Amino acid sequence: MRRIDPSKLELEERVVTINRVAKVVKGGRRFRFAALVVVGDKNGHVGFGTGKAQEVPDAIRKAIEDAKKNLIEVPLVGTSIPHEIIGHFGAGEVFLKPAAEGTGVIAGGPVRAVLELAGVQDILSKSLGSNTPINMIRATVNGLSELKRAEEVAKLRGKSVEELLG
């Protein structure tokens, strides 16, 4: 998979969650903040990242840097995706189904952030299993990265697009 250069894209960021985490030491608890951020150009590129620091802004900055390193390309067909797919990660599953134009993004929480920043405007989704934000985002990104256009599938099978689609 080729790496996508984030400097050539106009990326938009969205903070999904900020979590306070604690390390218990002899003198009490040491608190830090973990941030989960999604970045995308609303035109077929999306990525997510996590960052941890003692202050919230630092955690968000680290998460944005991480997200820019993990960009993927999403094949879009019009305003939706080419076909149905289930993305898996851990105990989390996200079902993604293309929808007719004008349907909108029907998705909950973290999944919505990923789909909107990827540039998908019409889609149906259902999250199954784990509802932890990081697992849902990873399952969604996993599903989106496995999508293939009809042309790619036809080329793999050595057939024409017309033969493939009937």
UniProtKB/Swiss-Prot annotation:
The transmembrane residues are none
Write out the domain note.
The N-terminal domain interacts with the head of the 30S subunit; the C-terminal domain interacts with the body and contacts protein S4. The interaction surface between S4 and S5 is involved in control of translational fidelity.
Functional description taken from the UniProt entry:
With S4 and S12 plays an important role in translational accuracy.
Protein name in the entry: Small ribosomal subunit protein uS5
Alphabetical keyword list: Ribonucleoprotein, Ribosomal protein, RNA-binding, rRNA-binding
The annotated subunit structure for this chain is:
Part of the 30S ribosomal subunit. Contacts proteins S4 and S8.
Domain named S5 DRBM: which ranges?
A: 11-74
The keyword Zinc belongs to this UniProt entry's keyword annotation: no
The family classification in the record reads: Belongs to the universal ribosomal protein uS5 family.
- Entry GO CC: small ribosomal subunit
**Gene Ontology BP term (one):** translation
Q: Name one GO molecular function term.
A: rRNA binding
Q: Which SUPFAM superfamilies match?
A: dsRNA-binding domain-like, Ribosomal protein S5 domain 2-like
Pfam families the record matches? Ribosomal_S5, Ribosomal_S5_C
